[in-house]
Amino acid sequence: GTRVRISRELLMQLISTVPPEFTLHARNPERTVQVGGKNQIFVPMYGAPYVRDLDNNRRYGSLEDLNNFHKLAYMLPALHSSSSICCEPMEVAVPKRHLHIIDSALTHSDKPFMGIVTSKERAEDVMKMAGIVFGDGFVKDNTVVVSITNCNSPLVWDQTMLDAMRVYASHNQPIIAAP
């Protein structure tokens, strides 16, 4: 690929447009949180392919596990978000898995949730689901989902992550870009 370089001036100009903090809205307004500034938010882990059950067995996650994790996140006052992919529900086919994951986050918790970044289409589905829950007009003007993207290696971003980032950015939703 081609290495893209951004000038320091442009980078600093773009960074200056980022608000020092923003409101991440929850389905339940009482669970809405402020992100940034001196605020700390705690969320469940994200993206685990395995779970460890009460018998100490390591196994693939299931939809039941995911639902239970979202219910736990909802009940724990120390957590400010239900995340989304607390574990992968491996019995659900990949093309539809994201729908079940977001449905679980929105059904079993009224806290803020995180988006899916595994394809442009899946990110678009997340935004459609957010529009159903919050109303398209509200989503247009407010932050309702935050997503985390990561590079494959230093200096390499794949098309999947970039496409998902574009979807969320086009809806004015924040993205955590992890190195």
Residue ranges and their predicted role:
Residues 57-179:
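Helix-rich catalytic cores of soluble enzyme domains
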